[in-house]
């Protein structure tokens, strides 16, 4: 979630054929069956290749022990567990990672329209939810750096 910003529903639907290794992209089907292409880093591509080969995956990227597509509650529980192991935040969910993806992109200078496209938002207003963190960051910088703050 953090690396791509995809939704939980999109993650569990990823099939091996959706990954274009040579283009370093992954195709996801978002809300209202809207398809979008997500870029992936070389490190993620290499990791995916190892993961797919190690588990001998054929159809879906994420499966249960029996080889069936994972269900949302299982992914939610795993994400919640691992966030709890590395962080003390109270909100522990796949959406928190998606939110963090968008916030970090914005805070590091990404154009809000590009973030909108990466997240698969139909309207910019949905993406603007993430700008509040940037406003807080600006307030902090202002308070720290301005002599009359």
Indicate residue ranges for each PLM-predicted region.
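C-terminal catalytic core of tyrosine-transesterase DNA break-rejoin enzymes
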Residues: 3, 81, 98-122, 129
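Flexible coil/turn residues that form the inter-helical turn or adjacent wing/linker of helix-turn-helix
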Residues: 4, 68, 90, 108
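Conserved tyrosine-mediated DNA breakage-rejoining catalytic core shared by Y-recombinases
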Residues: 4, 9, 13-50, 125
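ATP/adenylate-binding site constellation spanning eukaryotic-like Ser/Thr protein kinases
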Residues: 16, 41-45, 75, 99, ...
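Catalytic-site neighborhood detector that most strongly recognizes the C-terminal catalytic loop/helix
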Residues: 32, 125-147
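Active-site/catalytic core of tyrosine-dependent DNA strand-transfer enzymes
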Residues: 41-89
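Catalytic tyrosine of NAD(P)H-dependent dehydrogenase/reductases that use a Tyr as the general acid/base
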Residues: 91-95
């Amino acid at each position: 979630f953090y690396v791509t910003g995809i939704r939980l529903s999109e993650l569990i639907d990823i099939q091996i054929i959706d990954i274009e290794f040579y283009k370093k992209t992954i195709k996801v089907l978002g809300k209202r069956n809207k398809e979008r292409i997500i870029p992936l880093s070389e490190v993620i591509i290499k990791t995916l290749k190892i993961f797919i080969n190690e588990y001998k995956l054929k159809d879906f990227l994420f499966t249960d022990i029996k080889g069936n597509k994972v269900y949302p509650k299982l992914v939610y529980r795993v994400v919640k567990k691992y966030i709890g192991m590395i962080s003390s935040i109270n909100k522990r969910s796949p959406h928190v990672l998606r939110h963090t993806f968008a916030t970090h992109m914005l805070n590091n200078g990404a154009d809000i329209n590009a973030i909108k496209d990466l997240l698969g938002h139909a309207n910019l207003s949905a993406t603007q939810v993430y700008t509040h963190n940037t406003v807080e960051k600006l307030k902090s910088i202002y308070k720290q750096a301005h002599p009359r703050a």
